[in-house]
Amino acid sequence: MAKLLAMILAGGEGRRLDPLTRDRAKPAVPFGGRYRIVDFVLSNMANSGILKMKVVVQYKSESLNTHVQRAWRLTSLLNQYVELVPAQMRVGPKWFEGSADAIYQNLNIITDEEPDFTFVFGADHVYRMDARQMLEFHLDRKAELTVAAVPIPVQEASEFGIIEVDADGRMIGFVEKPQSAPKTIPGDPTRCLASMGNYLFSTDALVQEIVRDAGDPSSAHDFGKSIVASMYQRKRVYVYDFARNVVPGQTERERGYWRDVGSIDAYFQANMDLVAVDPVFSLYNDEWPIFTVQYNYPPAKFVFNNESDHRVGRATDSLVSEGCIISGSHVHHSILSPKVRVNSYATVDESIVFENVNIGRHCRIRRAIIDKHVDIPAHTTIGYDHEKDRKHFHVTESGIVIIPKGMRIEAGR
């Protein structure tokens, strides 16, 4: 049986997710109520039976470190692990200078473990994937590198690294964020193949390419721009079409679902994908669960049923986590993390509320993201007057209001 190792790149700063990433790395941003973004790649590896994972961290990693240590305790008796790898400056007094450099500075991990194949996956996307199927494709093609790719509309090509393939799936071209005339999928002029930032290497090839790149002073030391763009011209590089990946318990509608949540708007929409009656991405797949930390909180509670007084505790088309109290208020099309309290006569609509937030009486909240440890005074209105909101909060062009972690909001604002 082949020896497998997963190197998870989780050091991303996530500037486009500011202010959610002011105090945490992008993979540590909460998602779907009770998860962190990093849980999706780790769950995919665990469900695929790949149980040796190194999580490479750097930027503001305390929150991420704490989460991984609490949530991802595999058994050392069977030599299974999820271990954090901080920047150690093993090759000199410098931080990681790119995704490829993050692997180069930790090559000792790979050479010590001696895997036959090494997965190098990002930690900032939302999806389900059976990585074993990618391995089977890699072996079948006798590839030295396999790049996972997802079909996207031609109109979105400028946001991704776009791959050109031949009829057998071998990479014959790669352009990072093309601004015009992107190469399309053979036989389908309406779609392109976008790199997912997930790679599978035959380990000998990985070591050779990483060392080669490290010795090039002109390199950006980035997997897409540097490793992939160079390697496909010299070695056997194939492209695995993620749309062909089949996960147990997955609906046909969910197949091929993959979201880059690197911007506020994309992050918001991916969360909203979860709350429909028939969601395009379901958290309720017991055959391929998303694992996370288990909280010791009581169940969610809904109190008051005074219809005549409009004081009814209810939530519709929403995800409400453990420890929440919906007290005579209405939550609709929203996601609440643990220990959120929504007090009487308040309404929360199409919003994402992080842990330990208190929403006062008669508040009206719409299309907002509220970070942790925020107390919203009674009668506060957010999301209904963007000009007013911009004086106090961050508001995106699409009208999403973000309230940073721990922000103090004055009564009568």
From Swiss-Prot:
InterPro entries the UniProt entry points to: ADP-Glc_PPase, ADP_Glu_pyroP_CS, GlgC_bac, GlmU/GlgC-like_hexapep, NTP_transferase_dom, Nucleotide-diphossugar_trans, Trimer_LpxA-like_sf
Pathway noted in the entry: Glycan biosynthesis; glycogen biosynthesis
Record-linked PROSITE patterns: ADP_GLC_PYROPHOSPH_2
GO terms of biological process kind: glycogen biosynthetic process
Keyword ATP-binding: yes
Keywords linked to the UniProt accession: ATP-binding, Carbohydrate metabolism, Glycogen biosynthesis, Glycogen metabolism, Nucleotide-binding, Nucleotidyltransferase, Transferase
Single GO MF descriptor: ATP binding
EC number: 2.7.7.27
Reactions catalysed, as given in the entry: alpha-D-glucose 1-phosphate + ATP + H(+) = ADP-alpha-D-glucose + diphosphate
Enzyme class: transferase
Residues given in the record as alpha-D-glucose 1-phosphate binding sites: 161, 176-177, 195
Oligomer status and interactors: Homotetramer.
Function: Involved in the biosynthesis of ADP-glucose, a building block required for the elongation reactions to produce glycogen. Catalyzes the reaction between ATP and alpha-D-glucose 1-phosphate (G1P) to produce pyrophosphate and ADP-Glc.
HAMAP family cross-referenced by the UniProt entry: GlgC
NCBIfam families: glgC (TIGR02091), PRK00725.1 (NF001947), PRK00844.1 (NF002023)
Family: Belongs to the bacterial/plant glucose-1-phosphate adenylyltransferase family.
Name of the protein: Glucose-1-phosphate adenylyltransferase
